[in-house]
Amino acid sequence: MKTLNTRTGLAAMSVALMLALSACGGGAQAAGESSETTSSAPVATASASASAASTPTATKASASASVVAEPKGSEVVEVRAADDTNADATIAKQAAIKAAKRVVAQDNRLLNAWLHGDFEHTSDEELLKFVAPEKLKQVTDPIQSARNDIKNNGGVFTGNVTIRDVAVTDIFTYDYPDGTSYPYSVLRVKFCEDWTQLRTPDGERAVTGPDSTATVEVSVLRLQDGRYVYNGSRELGTGCASS
């Protein structure tokens, strides 16, 4: 029985997963951050095509309408803040933080769905609810890798990749190509990613050794239409402080 490509391929899928949208340098300016510290390395950036859209205010009402209750498996939902995040206010900051954590939670749910063989909601149209348009290929490639791993291993994986200790470590204001900007529009989210419960079809651990846990940082971007999308990730190191 072949094991999946260990963390180099599988976890790369999570840390690459829908992933991967290279690091954000560009128009991000520090606006505020949580009590946790983080590396000074850049996070992912969104180009003009990612943010070129209508710019409705992300109000509480519109946010509530856009959130699907308890999405399952590979279902992709738009993530919007539960309060208006256009203003530079504490309530807006907290709403943005919660939205960023929901993006990370959806990323994890989709990863597990694909590893379990659920590819129902992987059309370009559906994936674009969650990923910037110019990053689509960096999402579809890992999905194909999951399909290949399942085929090569003779079946789907069981168990789940889990995450814990999720915390927003940095928040920035993003300057969009048209000259507009919104506070709390780029957020870095750090967490522990744990692969110890994932099993191959024959019941063996899919990932073993020190690579079975990792500290990961995800960048989340607020698009001009109010959506918060997965905007890249990187592995900060193997193992987790809490492990």
PLM features per residue range, with description:
Residues 2-13:
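Bacterial N-terminal signal peptides that target proteins for export
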Residues 19-23:
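C-terminal motif of bacterial Sec signal peptides marking the signal peptidase cleavage site
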Residues 25-28:
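Bacterial signal peptide processing site
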Residues 35-67:
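Extracellular mucin-like PTS domains
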Residues 62, 71-74:
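Compositionally biased, low-complexity intrinsically disordered regions
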Residues 74-158:
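Core segments of small alpha/beta cavity-forming domains
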Residues 121-243:
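Structured, amphipathic secondary-structure segments that form assembly/contact surfaces
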